[in-house]
Amino acid sequence: MTTLGKRTGGQLIVEALKANGVSRVSCVPGESYLAVLDALYESGIETVVCRQEGGAAMMADTWGRLTGEPGICMVTRGPGATNASAGLHVARQDSIPMILFIGQVQRDAREREAFQEVEYRRAFTEFAKWVGEIDDARRIPEFVTRAFAVATSGRPGPVVLTLPEDMLVEEVEAPEAKAYTPVENHPGRKQMEKFTDLLANAKRPMFILGGTRWSEEAVASFKNFAESLKVPVGCS
């Protein structure tokens, strides 16, 4: 396990994003995660500042929709987070990989009805595949890499990570962030046999397409496949 000396929690967040290939972040800035914004400033990651959190979340949703990689969104606590829930819900319904980082009140103010405090595990459970809170800055590399894995594995969807403000400014030694390993999903042999049987016996077949990762090559390949069988195609 490699450590690189003491860094703030904000720096560790950005290092973990870079380790996982992030090149763009959408956000609405807020005081609760200023340490992350400071680290982003010289990171080389493009930071798109939005006027409203719902738009920032939907921008991240669109990135995930077009690339198959998790879109990254950052918002502040309380109303910032609840505004972002609209984009989170869309990503959940449409199976789009996305990670929403939310600034949170400092750890010693939790469960004390602090200003703009929200219990996100309860609030966002229906909107996300996983909702986690990073209480220990040393575990940031672990949490962020796990968020990427959860967002992209099985049925893709959004993940929420909350970031206590004091945790982000704490300086700690932490292991070097590692990239997640994408798990490719594809039909098995029996599923393909079933598909072939259904297609052969269908009286009026039609393909309905959806999901992510539709590259130019994938579109051309499916176009040739559908045309060879003379089957119409629709999109969800």
What role is predicted for each listed range?
Residues T2-S236:
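N-terminal alpha/beta PP-like core and its mobile active-site loop of ThDP/TPP-dependent enzymes
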